Amino acid sequence: MQNLLELKGISRRVSDRFSLRDVTLAVEPGQIVGFVGANGAGKTTTIRAALGLIKLDAGEVHLLGQRCDANAPDETQRHLRSRIGFVLDTCPFPSTLKVGQIETLVGPAYPTWDRKTFAGFINRFGLDAKTKVKDLSRGMGMKLQLACALSHNAKLLVLDEATAGLDPMAREELLDELLAFVADGQHSVLLS
């Protein structure tokens, strides 16, 4: 069975020091893979590399068995990245948009976006479509990101410190969603 994500010897240098050095990681279908480290150890940089948000100095990123880094064709990168859902440590959506408007921003980026699924998660997570993003608590902002991440048939979820700062109930609810996501053995989660 092919890995959903594979990082092969990735390195990233900032100024004269490494922020990542020779990182290798594989995420198989059905796994929840977490990695920990001290502040500044490179967790967020690793996630940004997996998402293709930074240029690497060395190594390769493979998604769904195909190379997906700066050396892969743009169309291949777009297609493969559309199969990833992500949750960042802070809510990235424009603060003036309402929860119900986020779909118009995110949906077009994913060919497999499902409006009905998104509406279902908004309802299930107790989000009010009329609430502005700036008025969401940290936990509700995470739920909004998770609703987006789960609404386009992603094979892999990548979460950057998604449980940091969440209250115990919100953390447990998030972890329950992740367990449900991988239950079929075909989907995976990478989280820091």
Question: Model-derived features: where do they sit?
Answer:
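The feature captures the beta-strand-to-loop junction immediately N-terminal to the Walker
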Residues: 36-38
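Helix N-cap at the start of a conserved alpha-helix in ABC-type nucleotide-binding domains
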Residues: 41, 168-170
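Helix-to-loop junction immediately C-terminal to a conserved catalytic motif
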Residues: 51
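Conserved ABC transporter NBD signature motif
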Residues: 59-72, 79-80
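ABC-family P-loop ATPase nucleotide-binding domains
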Residues: 78, 82, 86-145
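Catalytic Walker B motif of ABC-type/P-loop ATPase nucleotide-binding domains
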Residues: 157-161, 166
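Helical segment within the ABC ATPase nucleotide-binding domain
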Residues: 171-185
